Amino acid sequence: MSLPATAPAAAPVPKMEARHLSVRYGEKLAVKDISLALPERQVTALIGPSGCGKSTFLRALNRMNDLIPGARAEGEILLDGESVFDRHIDAVELRRRVGMVFQKSNPFPKSIFENVAYGLRVSGLKDRAALAERVERSLVNAALWDEVKDRLGESALGLSGGQQQRLCIARALAVEPEVVLMDEPASALDPIATAKIEDLIHHLKARYTIAIVTHNMQQAARVSDQTAFFYMGDLVEVGPTEQIFTNPSEQRTEDYVTGKFG
């Protein structure tokens, strides 16, 4: 007796999705007709040589490119199925929902506590007990609490580079985003600090949808579920990370991930 056919596994639901996205800086076309979905609660790595458009694409997701004179985007970016370019969408609120962690840690010249509390105060949270609870929770989620809990009043500038980067992640998490964008968050860190960031990413994806730009192929392979390869403004290939690194469909992808250029 034949067994009933098994239905194919459903594709992961996209939390964010770009459809035919192009980005220009003046006359320069930096990203060309990109369609890419970020599955919910997965890590998507964006890889490719310098200048290929991956950071431009990342910044487009929460409209950070709007802050660059002459930058303009065409196409669609959807967050939970709603266009981020709709007139009623407030860019500040969008950047709360879609947080960003930059390559270079940028702590404010304030105390550790105030670095994390700053965005909460700006958004209207004034109650001291509630602030303290949110700051602690954010530092715990960023795997930094145990290292700083006894010196929250000290300057954040006294932290190590790796600690400063985790503080910036805590600051992004404090305002309760749904998506976290990371632009080479470990490129300036030593191997031990890098390992802590990578371990943190593994834990964060249980709660957040994450996209990370990295030049480090080993890092992309370790932390991501899906990998997208960019080259000269084009999205060459996207797929499950293991497939991209072991059996890519495109020769350019294979040449890049095996170090033949980059």
From Swiss-Prot:
GO CC list: plasma membrane
GO molecular function: ATP binding; ATP hydrolysis activity; ATPase-coupled phosphate ion transmembrane transporter activity
Alphabetically ordered keywords of this record: ATP-binding, Cell inner membrane, Cell membrane, Membrane, Nucleotide-binding, Phosphate transport, Translocase, Transport
PANTHER family found in the cross-reference section: ABC TRANSPORTER I FAMILY MEMBER 17 (PTHR43423:SF1)
Entry similarity comment: Belongs to the ABC transporter superfamily. Phosphate importer (TC 3.A.1.7) family.
Domain ABC transporter: 16-257
Coiled-coil boundaries: none
Stated name of the protein: Phosphate import ATP-binding protein PstB
Assembly, per entry: The complex is composed of two ATP-binding proteins (PstB), two transmembrane proteins (PstC and PstA) and a solute-binding protein (PstS).
Subcellular location: Cell inner membrane
Biological role: Part of the ABC transporter complex PstSACB involved in phosphate import. Responsible for energy coupling to the transport system.
Protein's gene: pstB
Topological relation to the membrane, as annotated: Peripheral membrane protein
